[in-house]
Amino acid sequence: MKIKNIILLGLVLFVVSAVNAQDIISVAELSKISKNSDVIVVYAGAEDDFKVHITGAVSVPHTSLCNDTPVRGLIKPTAEMAKILGSAGISSDKTIVVYDEGSGKYAGRMYWILKYLGAENVKMLDGNLTAWKSGRKPVTGAPTKVVAATFTAKPQAGYLAKMDEVKTAIGNSAYVLVDARTPEEFAGKAETELRKGHIPGAVNINYETVLDPKGMLKTNAELKTLFESKGVTSDKTVIAFCETSVRAGIVFLALKGLGYSKVKVYDGAYLEWQATSSNKVE
């Protein structure tokens, strides 16, 4: 039976990769493999929203992997994150499927964190919990029995950008900075305690525009058109960010799915940038 499940898992993941290059898994596909011992489903939203969840899923709020200081939202040291993930029963050699309440931004953040930590087989549930419920798949309010595991972290430095690299990117044709905030935030028209505006030279691609009206990731053709219309081409090093880089994660996922090889997330994000008085904003 175990061998049969492994074969089924392999076939499903092959179909996913063949149909769509993104690390996306559909409701139908996840429902076939969710009980496989080599698969773990992870809810990345707030703990309070885990009251109704996919049967068998574990809860790891993305905020549990981040610090509040010195900059809110920065990821914790690698060893701390690995310990938290392991205590939730997540091992880096499993197929990890992340999801959230439906917005995609928390799942996207968790996706990026896991990829940065070196987990190779990470998928995001297309449409998240909203799609799972619409598909009449099983949910529960009962807690999931967690068996602690070992998460072996192998940080991928190429997925993380720091402020010095962002400074290098400004005015550099080999780079493009992608701000995943709303147009209002980008233009400095949103109510905020932060310095209003954006990092000089950045282009604005609101994270919501990579999703269709149902919260599903757009097709590769649609995404390619969207990114290239903003000058985000695969020959450049792309650095994505938002206010705290939560929303940047799904942009990272979409770009990697298109085959962009040089994609990073500026984890300090606009929050860190604008807090440094010597940094200019537009």
Please describe what each predicted stretch is.
Residues 1-8:
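Bacterial N-terminal signal peptides that target proteins for export
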Residues 8-17:
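Bacterial N-terminal signal peptides
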